[in-house]
Swiss-Prot record:
Coiled coil: none annotated. GO terms for molecular function: serine-type endopeptidase inhibitor activity. It comes from Notamacropus eugenii. GO terms for biological process: acute-phase response. The reactive center loop (RCL) extends out from the body of the protein and directs binding to the target protease. The protease cleaves the serpin at the reactive site within the RCL, establishing a covalent linkage between the serpin reactive site and the active site of the protease. The resulting inactive serpin-protease complex is highly stable. Plasma. N-glycosylated; contains bi- and triantennary glycans with a bisecting N-acetylglucosamine and fucose residue. GO terms for cellular component: extracellular region. The keyword Cell inner membrane does not apply. It comes from the Eukaryota. Its main location: secreted. The record marks 29-30 as: Reactive bond. It is found in: Secreted. This is Alpha-1-antiproteinase.
Length: 46
């Protein structure tokens, strides 16, 4: 499901675009608070 979020469409936040689909798969796996330094966006975004 792709919601028309202005944040994902922002330019400057193009990084979240990529991360957006990754977060959807990471959210169910991120039930335990795991800090991934390689993907700090997961926390922001979360």
């Amino acid at each position: 499901e792709e919601l028309p979020d202005s944040k994902d469409r922002a330019x400057p936040l193009s990084a979240s675009k990529x991360i957006s689909p990754y977060m959807k798969e990471a959210i169910p796996m991120s039930i335990p608070p795991v800090i991934d330094f390689n993907k700090p966006f997961l926390i922001i975004x979360y």
